[in-house]
């Protein structure tokens, strides 16, 4: 049986303070945006969610039941950079930031490297049972990037070349170890 995996990137609050590993709760406007896209997502037996507050709130705002937390879908561990802005990290550890953004094996912050994140997400994807059917998961943007790299067999250096805005959906189909990116035509009336 083919697995149909839809990854929905969590919504972002209106007043967004972008920080490494930031977990700002959703405001009413962001929750309304989630409800607006809910109908475009496929039906699934449950909605998996990463453990962050904004992923859980996004999953709950979809109105799908039950919402099941999946710890393996957690965001990248940013170590010492956790809670800091890009500007703060650049000012305090510019060389480390440059290394991290150019070398997927690097983890100058003492947390998880891009390569480690990619390996964790690949293991989760390939561990899905072949009879999983439809799977919908709300994830952070880094997790969606890692899943795309795995599905396409793309080099990990491509991680930073993928722009994944909040509430964007990625659909992958296949079986463990063999994945395809599925792109739906605009205006087809076809849901993801």
Language-model features: locations:
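Generic structural signal for well-ordered alpha-helical scaffold segments
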Residues: 35-39, 118, 122-129
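Short, active-site-adjacent cap segments at secondary-structure transitions
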Residues: 14, 54-56, 75-76, 143-146
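Active-site-proximal alpha-helix that buttresses catalytic centers in soluble enzyme cores
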Residues: 2-65
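Conserved histidine-centered catalytic loops in small-molecule metabolism enzymes
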Residues: 40-72, 98, 150, 173-192
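Generic beta-sheet signal
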Residues: 5, 45, 131-142
